[in-house]
Amino acid sequence: MNLHRIAFLSASMAAIGLVGAALAAEPPVLKAGLWEVTRTSTQQPDQKHLTTMCLDDSVQAEMREFGMGVAKEMCSQSDRRLEGNRMTITATCKLGPTTMKTQSVMVFNGNTSYHTEGTATYDPPFMNMAESKSTIDGKWTGPCKPGQQPGDITTETGQTLNMKQMMKK
């Protein structure tokens, strides 16, 4: 699996709190339907990136299983603690020759919204980045749109990708 696809899938799974799912602490199952996810990062602090995701329980379960496989394959350390509505995730993973250390804190508002703040360091730099910080906000907006399949992600450019299909490759 190439590094760009792993980075995209990891970012997508992180957006809904599913990375590192091999651990005992489980986040709430998010409400099925259409989710709007807004991400900002230190690389582009003045830009917000908006995607929508059509989620159901089966997509979340498959993403957790995929996340476990990626974590086992790429991470030497991962830890997830759930305290009330707050989940803290730390991990040390390899991206090719680069060691990535991450820490994310997610705060859930029931199963209909969440806020995440994350930091990652890269040694040596990954794609010219030594450090990145991001903020992700997700909220349930209603049922998936007609014609959407569970797992569909629509990017801000209008491109639709299906997470289930990407995880099978």
Question: What does each model-identified segment do?
Answer:
Residues 25-169:
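Subset-of-secretome marker
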Residues 18-24:
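Sec/Tat signal peptide C-region and signal peptidase I cleavage site
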Residues 1-12:
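Bacterial N-terminal signal peptides that target proteins for export
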Residues 14-16:
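Low-complexity, intrinsically disordered segments with a bias for serine/threonine
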